[in-house]
Design a protein with these regions (language model features):
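Long, well-ordered alpha-helical scaffolding segments within enzyme catalytic domains
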Residues: 26-43
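Short, surface-exposed recognition loops or helix-turn segments adjacent to catalytic cores
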Residues: 46-59, 142-148
Length: 168
């Protein structure tokens, strides 16, 4: 991903989101949007808290990782929320170094994460609808030129070089 940082695992039950804003102050912008996500989770009775610079935690376990980058005139905050991710598949795909886990006092990836489905009674469709109602403030219509630009970006992201090893 353009924002750098760790690896992002994606499957059909890992909810991803992005905010694109003209705000340029990195720490204020990042904090604003990550806190919006945490507050939304708290509305559901989930004891979500931001941790460090880029994680959202539930009872000390990570449920959301987030990143930030800036391009001229825009800042982008994006993240993931683990709803019902297959932990075994994720662990097989993402293998942080033992040194990183030990430095954080973590025995394994499994010990460090939690899934939203274990904290709420909403199914993924209901949770996604709740997320849209609480975090989206409107609809944007994309025109042909924007769609063409998106298709060009998508081509880059679908190359094996990007998927398996291109780092910003």
């Amino acid at each position: 991903r353009k924002s750098g940082g760790g690896c992002v695992y994606a499957d059909m039950t890992n909810i991803m989101f992005s905010y694109i804003t003209p705000d340029e102050n990195v720490s204020l912008t990042f904090s604003k949007y990550i806190n919006m996500v945490s507050e939304m989770l708290r509305k559901l009775g989930i004891p979500a808290e931001t941790s460090g610079r880029n994680d959202i935690m539930i009872d000390g376990r990570k449920v959301s990782g987030n990143a930030f980058y800036h391009i001229p005139g825009r800042s982008i905050v994006h993240g993931t929320m683990l709803y019902d991710t297959n932990i075994e598949n994720m662990v097989g795909a993402i293998t942080p170094s033992c040194e990183k886990l030990v430095s954080k006092g973590i025995q394994s990836v499994r010990q460090h994460i939690t899934l939203l489905k274990d904290h709420i009674s909403l199914d993924i469709e209901e949770f996604t609808a709740f997320t849209r109602r609480n975090l989206c403030n409107g609809e944007i219509v994309l025109y042909d030129d924007a769609i063409a630009q998106i298709a060009h970006i998508e081509e880059e992201y679908l190359t094996p070089e990007f998927i398996y090893g291109n780092n910003p």
